[in-house]
Amino acid sequence: TQLEAACPNVVSCADILALAAR
């Protein structure tokens, strides 16, 4: 995802938040 390219380190946290928000 775009986040991965922007912050591959934060992807884990951002991804979880995005999935939870969904």
Swiss-Prot record:
Record-level GO BP terms: hydrogen peroxide catabolic process; response to oxidative stress
Major site of localization recorded for this protein: secreted
InterPro entries hit by this protein: Haem_peroxidase, Haem_peroxidase_sf
Enzyme class: oxidoreductase
Record GO terms (molecular function): heme binding; lactoperoxidase activity; metal ion binding
Keyword annotations from UniProtKB, A to Z: Calcium, Cell wall, Heme, Hydrogen peroxide, Iron, Metal-binding, Oxidoreductase, Peroxidase, Secreted
Family: Belongs to the peroxidase family. Classical plant (class III) peroxidase subfamily.
Residue stretches in coiled coil: none
Cofactor annotation comment: Binds 1 heme b (iron(II)-protoporphyrin IX) group per subunit.
Pfam families with a match to the protein in the record: peroxidase (PF00141)
Catalytic function, reaction form: 2 a phenolic donor + H2O2 = 2 a phenolic radical donor + 2 H2O
Protein name: Peroxidase 5
Function, in words: Removal of H(2)O(2), oxidation of toxic reductants, biosynthesis and degradation of lignin, suberization, auxin catabolism, response to environmental stresses such as wounding, pathogen attack and oxidative stress. These functions might be dependent on each isozyme/isoform in each plant tissue.
Cellular localisation: Secreted; Secreted, Cell wall
Cofactor: heme b; Ca(2+)
Entry annotated with the keyword Mitochondrion: no
Organism: Cycas revoluta
Record PROSITE patterns: PEROXIDASE_4
GO terms under cellular component: extracellular region
Gene3D superfamilies (UniProt xref): 1.10.520.10
EC number: 1.11.1.7
